[in-house]
Amino acid sequence: MPTTRVLLPALFLFLCIASRAAQPTAPPVIALWEHGAPGFETRRNEPEQHQDWWYKNIHNPSLTVFLPAEGKANGTAVIVAAGGGHRELVFNPEGVEPAQYLASLGITAFALKYRLFREPGSKYTLDNTAEDIRRAMRTVRARAAEWHIDPRRIGVMGWSAGGEVAALVAYSPGGGDSKAQDPVERASARPDFQILIYPGPLGIPARVPRDAPPLFLLGAADDEYVAPVLFDLSRKYHEAGASIETHIYAQGKHGFNMGQRSKYVSIQRWPHRLTEWLEDRELTRAH
């Protein structure tokens, strides 16, 4: 009996240590501004609200970093902006899950938490959201060497309202300020390519420039809100002679995420179409 009493606590301690060691390490989170967003520094420590798949009350914009497995990084990076109507952030299904998928392809992925200007009681505006995505692009480009990223292969992926966020940087010059004291602000905020999944209409320009970032565009024809955006943006890219690949599925509605919860086989398999596009553009190949 005495021996048993000695062994049981030791066994319990061993199991606790083993369990802790087996738990995956949480991905690192990087605040976009060290002291908080400009003009709202005093709010940076306010706790976020979240439950299941959504986040709200975001006052300290950040990037959650998803690194490829050791030895698999190919030099490409993507910043992922989830949707949620600018009222909430569908962070897990449209931020974390696609970032993990991209990391499995050797792409260094960053899930963005940006400020929500339509959240009830919000003091933010669309300009603040634009500040967040521009700062995110500049942060990744300025620190590209740290993550073994090619600064000429940094893209943006936007879902629904996150597609509107992506448009805020895709169709503007975004050049850095060479005289800025902050080295991050010297980097360009313009993405080298973009991936838009059922994007909203906000931020889509009246005319797409010929040098617009190459675009992978995807959604469903029975998505009443988004279908007109898909056709309109495809037409504008075609008229400009800019590079675009469009996938419009007959059925799927809105918010099918990575497809695994859809009853439609074509929607379930849509990430394969994205992978093929990335491969065709040699964005999954190490340079």
Report the location of each language-model feature:
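Short amphipathic alpha-helix adjacent to the substrate-entry channel of hydrolases
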Residues: F91-F110, S234-R235
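Catalytic nucleophile-loop/oxyanion-hole region of alpha/beta-hydrolase
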Residues: V90-F91, E97, R115-W147, Q260-I267
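Primarily recognizes the serine-hydrolase "nucleophile elbow" in alpha/beta-hydrolase
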Residues: E131-A212
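Active-site glycine-rich loops that stabilize anionic/oxyanionic intermediates
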Residues: A82-R87, A221-D222
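Short beta-strand/loop motif that positions the catalytic acidic residue
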Residues: F216-G219
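N-terminal cap/lid segment of alpha/beta-hydrolase-fold proteins
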Residues: Q23-K72
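Conserved alpha/beta-hydrolase "acid-adjacent" motif
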Residues: E224-F231
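C-terminal catalytic histidine-bearing segment of alpha/beta-hydrolase fold enzymes
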Residues: H238-H287
